[in-house]
Amino acid sequence: MLIGFGYDVHRLVPGRPLVLGGVEIPSKRGLEGHSDADVALHALMDALLGAAGLGDIGTHFPPTDPAWAGANSLDLLRRVVGLLAEEGYRPVNCDITVVAERPKIGPYVPAMRERIGAVLGVEPRRVSIKATTNEQMGFVGREEGIAAYAVALIAGR
């Protein structure tokens, strides 16, 4: 078994939907990015790719490539799971921490776990999603952006 770690951060801006863990969350601001800017899934993809020694999402889905403009990160995650399968790996579990002052994501976590688990091919209980604040410190504390960390375990098929 192999383990990988991922991190991502995006700026909060008006006029964009807020998507976290594959779920759209009501908010006056969303995350800025080339794709849907889902920091939770981007951190998870980096963790999965890192565990397999396959680089990072910027290598596979460069922000300079118009093909990925507005991409749904669940679709990108499916592609990452496919890349793992080509190398003989499968996801086992993951643990994601979202760092944001608001919105509170607790009510949306069950849907996130379901959606991510379905793409990874694991039971939702194998997908852990937690949230914390930055205690009003730094860019997250000033509500300028949202960050996410992820750890993923993969195994050979």
Curated annotation (Swiss-Prot):
Involved in the biosynthesis of isopentenyl diphosphate (IPP) and dimethylallyl diphosphate (DMAPP), two major building blocks of isoprenoid compounds. Catalyzes the conversion of 4-diphosphocytidyl-2-C-methyl-D-erythritol 2-phosphate (CDP-ME2P) to 2-C-methyl-D-erythritol 2,4-cyclodiphosphate (ME-CPP) with a corresponding release of cytidine 5-monophosphate (CMP). A divalent metal cation binds at D8, H10, H42. It comes from Symbiobacterium thermophilum (strain DSM 24528 / JCM 14929 / IAM 14863 / T). 4-CDP-2-C-methyl-D-erythritol 2-phosphate binds at D8, V9, H10, H34, S35, D56, I57, G58, T132, T133, N134, E135, F139, R142. The keyword Ligase does not apply. GO terms for biological process: isopentenyl diphosphate biosynthetic process, methylerythritol 4-phosphate pathway; terpenoid biosynthetic process. Binds 1 divalent metal cation per subunit. The gene is ispF. It holds the Pfam family YgbB. Keywords: Isoprene biosynthesis, Lyase, Metal-binding. GO terms for molecular function: 2-C-methyl-D-erythritol 2,4-cyclodiphosphate synthase activity; metal ion binding. The keyword Metal-binding applies. Gene3D superfamilies: 2-C-methyl-D-erythritol 2,4-cyclodiphosphate synthase. This is 2-C-methyl-D-erythritol 2,4-cyclodiphosphate synthase. The record marks H34, T133 as: Transition state stabilizer.
